[in-house]
From Swiss-Prot:
Its main location: cytoplasm. CDD domains: bZIP_ATF4. Residues 208-271 form the bZIP domain. This is Cyclic AMP-dependent transcription factor ATF-5. It holds the Pfam family bZIP_1. The modification Phosphoserine is found at residue 256. It is found in: Cytoplasm; Nucleus; Cytoplasm, Cytoskeleton, Microtubule organizing center, Centrosome. It comes from Homo sapiens. Induction: Down-regulated by pro-apoptotic stimuli. However, the pro-apoptotic cisplatin increases protein levels by inhibiting polyubiquitination. IL1B increases protein levels through protein stabilization and increase of translation efficiency. Residues 236-250 are annotated as: Leucine-zipper.
Length: 282
């Protein structure tokens, strides 16, 4: 057996399990290969009708009876006895390394599963914050600027100016005559008050309004309290009157029942006396 065949057999036995080596060919029991022949010798024997390699004569030509040749396949069959039908080969034992790796992998999977099961659930995502409500539009108030009337100078006619000028000239010519006083100008009119109220009330008025509003609220609360108490008193009084009437009715019934019981007692006493007299007379 050649070295390559031996190495191939050892490699197959190392890679495959022991139960699966039955189909391998035992290279040690194969018949040895015949010695190589020269090509001319094989061809010449075939052409001349001579003997083939085994030395046996052929019935016909050298290429027609090879299908009828019997071959012994016992050397190629496995040495182990064949398994009965319906039975499966026993599984090969797994190596300890694979078992250790499988157990480690199983432990790791169990640890990961426990970790994911013990982990606290994630909180639900918080809803996005609502957008702020739109601000109401500011009321557009027509801002009217207060109008101020400028004082107009008094209108003097040209005749008045000429008269004043002539008087001044005449007064300067006459000695001892005091000059005329200048014409009195009317006082400037006071600026008109703005017709529109200020946008913000005065703080003093706001304080007074708050006090008045609180006073009104206290009055209304006291009035509601008195009304509620009056209604409760009326309800209690009506209930008391109803209970008193019921009490009187029950008392009258009890008195009537008591009179009936006394009447029955008197009847029983009379009956007993009558029977006793009859028994005595008999």
């Amino acid at each position: 057996m050649s070295l390559l065949a031996t190495l191939g057999l050892e490699l197959d036995r190392a890679l495959l399990p022991a139960s699966g080596l039955g189909w391998l060919v035992d290279y040690g029991k194969l018949p040895p290969a015949p010695a190589p022949l020269a090509p001319y010798e094989v061809l010449g024997g075939a052409l001349e009708g001579g003997l083939p390699v085994g030395g046996e004569p052929l019935a016909g030509d050298g290429f027609s009876d090879w299908m009828t040749e019997r071959v012994d396949f016992t050397a190629l069959l496995p040495l182990e006895p064949p398994l009965p039908p319906g039975t499966l080969p026993q599984p090969s034992p797994t190596p300890p390394d694979l078992e250790a790796m499988a157990s480690l992998l199983k432990k790791e999977l169990e640890q990961m599963e426990d970790f994911f099961l013990d982990a606290p659930p994630l909180p639900p995502p918080s809803p996005p914050p609502l957008p702020p409500p739109p601000l109401p539009p500011a009321p557009s108030l027509p801002l009217s600027l207060p109008s101020f009337d400028l004082p107009q100078p008094p209108v003097l006619d040209t005749l008045d100016l000429l008269a004043i000028y002539c008087r001044n000239e005449a007064g300067q010519e006459e000695v001892g005559m005091p000059p005329l006083p200048p014409p009195q100008q009317p006082p400037p009119p006071s600026p008109p008050q703005p017709s529109r109220l200020a946008p913000y009330p005065h703080p003093a008025t706001t304080r007074g309004d708050r006090k008045q509003k609180k006073r009104d609220q206290n009055k209304s609360a006291a009035l509601r309290y008195r009304q509620r108490k009056r209604a409760e008193g009326e309800a209690l009084e009506g209930e008391c009157q109803g209970l008193e009437a019921r009490n009187r009715e029950l008392k009258e019934r009890a008195e009537s029942v008591e009179r009936e019981i006394q009447y029955v007692k008197d009847l029983l006493i009379e009956v007993y006396k009558a029977r006793s007299q009859r028994t005595r007379s008999c």
